[in-house]
C-alpha cells in the first residue's frame, strides 16, 4: 500500500515542501530564519486576532480599548506584548534572513528574491499601520509625518495624502482604514510567502559554498525539521524573555500618552526597525529627495542580482567582499542609531555620511571588490 502522504492531493504538497524535500546537507543555522519568519507570522496573526476581538478602531476609544485589553481582559497584557514584541522579533529575523541572502548570493534566484523584496515592503507597511492603532502620541504623529511624505510627489501629492487620510488630517477615517489594512495584509503576506516557497522549491535551496548541491542532498525531515524546532524554541525563549521581563524596552514612552493633535512630541521617531530608513530620509534636506532615498534604500535590493560581478556566488571564499559586507552591516547599525537621535550637530553630518556610504557600498564598492577578487584569482 502506498503512503497517504505521497498520494493524497493535499498531503502530497505538504510532503514535497516539508518532509521529502531534498535539501543540501551543509546548510547552516543562517538557513533557519525562513521557518522562524513563518512562526513569527503565525504568532502575529493569532495574537492579532485575539487583540482585534477587544480593540475598537475609533479615535475616541482606541487608546482606552488597548488599556482595557491590558487591564481587564484575561491574559490580555501578555497577548498585547507578545504582538508588539513579536513584531520586533519578526524584523530581527527578516534582517538576518535578507543579510544571509546577500552574503551567500541567494539573490541569484530571481523570482524568489523579488517576491522576498515585495514581502519586506508588505511587512513594513503592516508594521507601520499596526503602530498607529493604539492611538498614542507617537502613533498619531508617526502616522502624520509618514503619510505626509506622499505630499512630496509632484502634482498628485496633496490629493493623494488627503485620499489616504480620508479627510484633511489624520483622524477617525484614517484609523479605521489602517485597522482594516492591518488586519488583511498579514494574510496577503502569508499568501506571498507560499509563492516565495513555491519559487524556492523550483530551484532548491542555496548553501554556504554557493556551489550546486545536487550531488549531495538529504531529506528535509527529520534533519531540518528538528533543526527548525531548535531554532523555534530559541526564538520563543528570546520573545518571552522580552515580553515577561522588559515588555517596553523597544517601545516609546510617548505612546503611553493619548494622541493629541495640538501637542507635538519633541522627537518624532518610528519603531527601532525603521530607524535606518528614517535616518536616510532625514539626511536629505529636500522633501522629495528624502522620500526617494527612503524608497530606494529598500528597493536597491532588487538591483543586487545586476550588481553581482563575482565569478563565485557566495562570499564564503571572498575575503575582500566579506570586509565590505560587514562594513555595510556596521553602516546600517550606525544609521539605526542616528535615526533615534535628535536632528542636531554632530548627528546630522554622521547621518549624511552614513547614508552616502550605504548607497556607495552597495552600488560601487561591492561590485568593485568582486571584480578585484576575480582578477586576483586570474579569472
From Swiss-Prot:
It holds the Pfam family Cytochrome_B. Keywords: Electron transport, Heme, Iron, Membrane, Metal-binding, Mitochondrion, Mitochondrion inner membrane, Respiratory chain, Transmembrane, Transmembrane helix, Transport, Ubiquinone. GO terms for molecular function: metal ion binding; ubiquinol-cytochrome-c reductase activity. Gene3D superfamilies: Cytochrome Bc1 Complex, Chain C (1.20.810.10). A ubiquinone binds at residue 201. One of its GO terms (biological process) is mitochondrial electron transport, ubiquinol to cytochrome c. The chain crosses the membrane at residues 33-53, 77-98, 113-133, 178-198, 226-246, 288-308, 320-340, 347-367. It is a multi-pass membrane protein. Heme b b562 binds at residues 83, 182. InterPro entries: Cyt_b/b6_C (IPR005798), Cyt_b/b6_C_sf (IPR036150), Cyt_b/b6_N (IPR005797), Cytb/b6-like_sf (IPR027387), Cytochrome_b (IPR030689), Cytochrome_b_C_euk/bac (IPR048260), Cytochrome_b_N_euk/bac (IPR048259), Di-haem_cyt_TM (IPR016174). It comes from the Eukaryota. One of its GO terms (cellular component) is mitochondrial inner membrane. Binds 2 heme b groups non-covalently. Heme 1 (or BL or b562) is low-potential and absorbs at about 562 nm, and heme 2 (or BH or b566) is high-potential and absorbs at about 566 nm. Belongs to the cytochrome b family. Component of the ubiquinol-cytochrome c reductase complex (complex III or cytochrome b-c1 complex) that is part of the mitochondrial respiratory chain. The b-c1 complex mediates electron transfer from ubiquinol to cytochrome c. Contributes to the generation of a proton gradient across the mitochondrial membrane that is then used for ATP synthesis. The cytochrome bc1 complex contains 11 subunits: 3 respiratory subunits (MT-CYB, CYC1 and UQCRFS1), 2 core proteins (UQCRC1 and UQCRC2) and 6 low-molecular weight proteins (UQCRH/QCR6, UQCRB/QCR7, UQCRQ/QCR8, UQCR10/QCR9, UQCR11/QCR10 and a cleavage product of UQCRFS1). This cytochrome bc1 complex then forms a dimer. This is Cytochrome b. It comes from Damaliscus pygargus. The lineage of its organism: Eukaryota, Metazoa, Chordata, Craniata, Vertebrata.
Amino acid at each position: 500500500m502506498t503512503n497517504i502522504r505521497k498520494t493524497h492531493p493535499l498531503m502530497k504538497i505538504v510532503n514535497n515542501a516539508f518532509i521529502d524535500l531534498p535539501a543540501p546537507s551543509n546548510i547552516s543555522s543562517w538557513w533557519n530564519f525562513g521557518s522562524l519568519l513563518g512562526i513569527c507570522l503565525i504568532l502575529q496573526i493569532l495574537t492579532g486576532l485575539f487583540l482585534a476581538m477587544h480593540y475598537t478602531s475609533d479615535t475616541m476609544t482606541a487608546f482606552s480599548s488597548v488599556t482595557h485589553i491590558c487591564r481587564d481582559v484575561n491574559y490580555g497584557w501578555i497577548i498585547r506584548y507578545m504582538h508588539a514584541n513579536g513584531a520586533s522579533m519578526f524584523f530581527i529575523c527578516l534582517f538576518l534572513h535578507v543579510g544571509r541572502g546577500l552574503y551567500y548570493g541567494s539573490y541569484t534566484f530571481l523570482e524568489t528574491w523579488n517576491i522576498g523584496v515585495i514581502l519586506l515592503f508588505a511587512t513594513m507597511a503592516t508594521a507601520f499601520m499596526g503602530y498607529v492603532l493604539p492611538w498614542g502620541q507617537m502613533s498619531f504623529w508617526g502616522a502624520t509625518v509618514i503619510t505626509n511624505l506622499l505630499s512630496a510627489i509632484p502634482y498628485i501629492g496633496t490629493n493623494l495624502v488627503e485620499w489616504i487620510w480620508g479627510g484633511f488630517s489624520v483622524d477617525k477615517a484614517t484609523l479605521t482604514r489602517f485597522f482594516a489594512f492591518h488586519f488583511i495584509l498579514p494574510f496577503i503576506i502569508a499568501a506571498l510567502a507560499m509563492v516565495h516557497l513555491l519559487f524556492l522549491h523550483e530551484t532548491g535551496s542555496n548553501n554556504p559554498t554557493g556551489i550546486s548541491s545536487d550531488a549531495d542532498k538529504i531529506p528535509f525531515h527529520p534533519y531540518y525539521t528538528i533543526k527548525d524546532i531548535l531554532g523555534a524554541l530559541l526564538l520563543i525563549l528570546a520573545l518571552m524573555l522580552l515580553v515577561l521581563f522588559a515588555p517596553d524596552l523597544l517601545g516609546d514612552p510617548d505612546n503611553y500618552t493619548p494622541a493629541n493633535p495640538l501637542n507635538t512630541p519633541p522627537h518624532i521617531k518610528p519603531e527601532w526597525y525603521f530607524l535606518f530608513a528614517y535616518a536616510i530620509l532625514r539626511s536629505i534636506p529636500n522633501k522629495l529627495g528624502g522620500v526617494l532615498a527612503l524608497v530606494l534604500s529598500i528597493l536597491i535590493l532588487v538591483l543586487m542580482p545586476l550588481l553581482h560581478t563575482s565569478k563565485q556566488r557566495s562570499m564564503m571564499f571572498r575575503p575582500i567582499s566579506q570586509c565590505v559586507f560587514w562594513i555595510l552591516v556596521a553602516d546600517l547599525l550606525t544609521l539605526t542609531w542616528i535615526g533615534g537621535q535628535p536632528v542636531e550637530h554632530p548627528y546630522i553630518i554622521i547621518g549624511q555620511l552614513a547614508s552616502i556610504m550605504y548607497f556607495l557600498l552597495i552600488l560601487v564598492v561591492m561590485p568593485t571588490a568582486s571584480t578585484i577578487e576575480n582578477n586576483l584569482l586570474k579569472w
